[in-house]
Amino acid sequence: MAFAGLSCMALLGLPQSAVAQDMTVYPYAEDYQVITRDGAWCWFSDPRAIYVDDKMFGGFVDKEGSIWAFCYDPSTCQSKQYKLFNKLDYDDHANPSIMALSDQRLVLFFSAHGGTKNSPIYYAVSKYPSDISSWEEVQEINPEMEGSLGVCYTNPVMLSDENNRVYLFFRGRDFKPTCIYTDDLKTWSQPINLVRNDPGYGQGGRPYTKITTNHKDKIFFAFTDAHPRDRATNSIYFMMYKNGKICKADGTVVSETLGSIIPSQVDKVYDATRTFDKAWIWDIAFDESEKPILVYARFSDRDNKHSYWYARWNGIKWENHKITDAGQWFQRTEYVKEKPEYECNYSGGVYLDHENPNILYTSRP
């Protein structure tokens, strides 16, 4: 767990519990180690930090828009930083994602905010295993896609059962979830549209996606219809990739290939058309039986309040449980009675412990 700016630059820290899994005594929220006092994350690029060779590695974007890698050693409480790219984009959407290759070399992926700038996807590979002190030259990927706007939100996945093929998921043109893949980190596939709108909604939606993997043969996806400010009935969906196919949580195959899924084909985990409380996905994990678990925020327009919810696939159906009320949106702009808050769907946040998803972390403003 880490503290990160969502629409502003913030101190980035890691709780001591993130590196010590003994939960006999639950930590205070203030019990964290500082990684940087000038760094931000956005919650739709993952992984933002990984644990390799008893150290934590990750990245962040600073207040000048520069991209950094970091290493944190919990045995000494010392951290190191390395600037990978200078002044890319002053925007939390530019924060990098990170993965480790089979030889423990590190790869960082990043891009500018696709809604404001049209930049490539950048990536860099460390020269040595578990080491941020030296990197190969930064590479560019320029996927050929139809539509407008740029790319952002990188999510790399490597599957050992597919000879360590690397899949890179990201927001592509027209805000649509997209995928490319590589077997050598040099040559990339043509882009694959992952999710598209149900026909009745046209092409204007922007599904927000969270991704996790067992690193072997499965990739788990949770996604929305759109941004919650754009859809009064913004619901939450689930699907899973396995053996080249897209499945529901019960294993039912809905597509023989990766891509071009519409929401009505897969599991609707939370149905906002029944409550008219729109939702936004926050995290996805799975239990020891690889049954998926999601956490998300719901927004009530009746009283302008947020709430956090936990959804678990029990092997037969999805169970949704309320965690807690979550206050209102976290930013505090100048209040004008005649002018409603435009960005009222940004919550403090809710995250799962991926080692034990019975544990979760919340923040309430």
Language-model regions: role of each:
Residues 22-365:
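Extracellular, repeat-based ectodomains that mediate carbohydrate processing or recognition
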Residues 13-22:
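Boundary at the C-terminal end of the N-terminal hydrophobic targeting segment
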Residues 2-13:
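Bacterial N-terminal signal peptides
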